[in-house]
C-alpha cells in the first residue's frame, strides 16, 4: 500500500496517513509506504507514531501547487495550498511490483482490497461511486465537465508494473506537465489541479478517445461524503456522518 501525505498550513495529512496505516494493518495486513514532502515534520512531530510505516520516501516539495477551499462542516472554510501532484509520479516511487494507492482520508473497514491481488487486470480504478447522503445530486463525479469524458476516482487505484501501466503513467506525467493544454482541450474550467481529471483524461486517451475498457473497477463499493459533512464518530467498523 502507498499513502501520499503533504501537509499544508492547516491540514495534517501526516496524521491522517498514520490513522489510515493503522487501519490498513488491521484489515489488510499489508506493508504501507508513506511518500511525503513533509518528512521533517513527520520526524519531529510523530517520532514514535511514524513506525506504523514500513517505509518512508521523502520527495522534494513541488512549487507549482494550486489552492482550493477546504471546508470543515457547513460554516468554516479556508483557502489553502493543495499539494496533490505527487500521485502522478507514483509508478516510479512505489517500492512494490503490485501497488494500491489510497488517499489518506479513505477509511478502510474490511479486507475487500485484497481481491486486487487475486485478479488478472493490471490497472483498477473506481468509476462508479455513491454519496453517503440521500439528498444531494452531485453531477461532477459522472464526467469531468458537463457532457465531457467519464470521471474516474484517482482516490484509490491498483496497478502492477507492466509495459502497459508504464505507458499509462508516462502519459499521466505528460498530462501533468502539460496540464494547461489538456485543461483547455477538455474544457475544464476549475482552477484546481485534480488527479481525478488527469487520470480520467489518460484513460480516455488510452481507450482511443472514446469510452472503453482499459480501466477495470476496484473491488467493492466506493462511498463518499462532502467536506460540508461532519464526522460524528468513527470506531472499528461504524461511523456516523451528519
Task: Please name every model-derived segment.
Residues 1-242:
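Glycosyltransferase catalytic domains, chiefly GT-A lineage
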Amino acid at each position: 500500500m502507498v499513502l501520499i501525505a503533504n501537509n499544508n498550513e492547516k491540514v495534517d495529512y501526516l496524521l491522517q496517513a498514520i490513522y489510515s496505516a493503522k487501519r490498513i494493518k488491521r484489515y489488510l495486513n499489508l506493508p504501507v509506504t508513506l511518500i511525503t514532502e513533509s518528512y521533517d515534520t513527520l520526524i519531529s512531530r510523530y517520532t514514535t507514531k511514524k513506525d506504523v510505516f514500513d517505509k518512508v520516501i521523502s520527495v522534494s516539495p513541488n512549487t507549482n501547487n494550486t489552492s482550493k477551499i477546504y471546508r470543515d462542516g457547513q460554516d468554516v472554510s479556508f483557502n489553502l495550498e493543495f499539494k496533490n501532484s505527487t500521485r502522478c509520479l507514483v509508478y516510479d516511487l512505489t517500492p512494490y511490483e503490485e501497488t494500491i494507492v489510497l488517499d489518506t482520508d479513505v477509511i478502510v473497514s474490511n479486507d475487500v482490497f485484497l481481491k486486487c491481488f487475486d485478479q488478472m487486470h493490471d490497472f483498477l480504478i473506481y468509476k462508479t461511486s455513491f454519496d453517503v447522503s440521500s439528498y444531494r445530486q452531485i453531477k461532477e463525479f459522472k464526467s469531468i465537465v458537463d457532457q465531457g469524458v467519464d470521471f474516474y476516482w484517482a482516490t484509490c487505484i491498483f496497478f502492477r508494473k507492466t509495459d502497459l501501466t508504464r505507458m499509462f503513467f508516462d502519459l499521466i506525467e505528460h498530462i501533468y506537465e502539460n496540464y494547461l493544454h489538456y485543461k483547455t482541450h477538455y474544457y475544464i474550467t476549475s482552477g484546481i489541479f485534480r488527479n481525478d481529471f488527469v487520470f480520467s483524461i489518460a484513460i480516455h486517451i488510452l481507450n482511443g478517445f472514446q469510452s472503453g475498457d482499459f480501466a477495470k473497477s476496484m473491488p467493492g463499493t466506493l462511498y463518499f461524503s462532502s467536506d460540508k459533512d461532519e464526522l460524528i464518530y468513527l470506531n472499528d467498523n461504524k461511523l456516523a456522518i451528519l
